[in-house]
Amino acid sequence: QIKVDKVTFSMDSGIPEEHDQNRLPGSFVRVVAAVDLVLTEGLFSSVSTVVTHSNLHGEGFQKVLEFAKSRGIRVDIQIAEPVGKWDGIKEDLITPEDADYIKHLRDTMGQADNGQPMINRDTYCGDNDHCPAGTEFMSISANGELLSCNFLQFSLGNVRDGSIAQKRRDLLTCSWFDNSHRTCICGEDDEFIDRFIVPFKEEAKPLDAYSVFDLPNAWPGRSAQ
């Protein structure tokens, strides 16, 4: 047994044409069919969707919610982040009021069929919402770069070079990675974005986390980049 209990599919909009604009023609129909197949096989499913300030209250997002409710599955909400094609761009990030609206949805939409809240964000941690980057979540890129989060393009070095545990300990000396920040630092914290993302928008990624965050150069064999 592979011990898989849930399969998540991306749904950019509950309007087929809008979803397919971001994917490929016919993609929406295939997502719906895939969700239904997973449920038929007795597994749980969910849909993941990216929200921006401009689409959060739009029809496409509302129809994602309607679809999820009709299937009894969870909606994993990913807020827009100023990275990748949106590197350093802040104009369509969610606002505090948008975040409150998402929390309102979590509190009022009830539970999915597996007993979990219908609405989920990676910052939701019971009564202690916080950014989990580096503390409860890390990412490894395709070529082995260790990142505090898949959205935060600051490398702690390659996993082949030195101890992952030591690199994480180095990261945790920085106060940005201590569970005290109640919002996503990459997508919601203006101070973090203005200090560590906007100034580097034209530079190749990933950046050196040790230099950017002034981390201790603790693990053996590392040389400054």
Regions found by a protein language model. Give the residues of each.
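Radical SAM enzyme [4Fe-4S]-AdoMet core and its adjacent flexible, acidic
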Residues: 5-6, 10-134, 142-147, 151
